[in-house]
Amino acid sequence: MGFSDKQQKILQILVKEKEGITIEQFSKILEISRSAIHQHMTVLERDGYVRKSASMQTGGRPGTTFVLTEKGIHIFPKHYSLFSEILINLIRQKLGSKGLIEYLQELGVSLSETKKQALKDKPLNEKIEMAVAIMQELGYEAQIAKQNHTIDAYNCVFHDLAFKNEEVCELDLSLLSSLLDSKIKHVCCMAKGDKCCRFKVLPDDKAKTDH
């Protein structure tokens, strides 16, 4: 994602001005023409970083304000991984590694609760297809593997965290186990050097996970 200097300044202004800014206001702040601002806003709106909001009066003339979209907000640095690592370490210190695993398993089950009802009473193959779609919604590059009843994920949404704390994988296993009401075998793991994370669904033994 490449932004010009002016586009970066526009985004930086909008992250501070939650109620939005008009083209007229941008023109005054950045000291460039309204037509130049309009061109930048057209590009940013087209690419999904800003959107038009309410109209407001600016210097006697009505103007449409622009605000950041969720996509626009997410370009700014966040420190979720640092926060998550501190949280994981604190839980391990208080509960031990076993307690951390149990906590992550509970988290996986909780994550599945809003989605699980849609999979109820479906054939296993259909459940697996739906579970893959749910994983994709959560940010995984997941697909059904060639092997029967197997899911491959080619990225890890907890990448750095999982590489430093292998217990984090329990969340994935618990999520899939709860969604599919089946035992899940963690066949391959990127945190251990494999090319993907591979999850084998074992339909005969319910609601357990297995490395």
Tell what function each PLM region has.
Residues 63-97:
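Conserved segment of winged-helix/HTH DNA-binding domains
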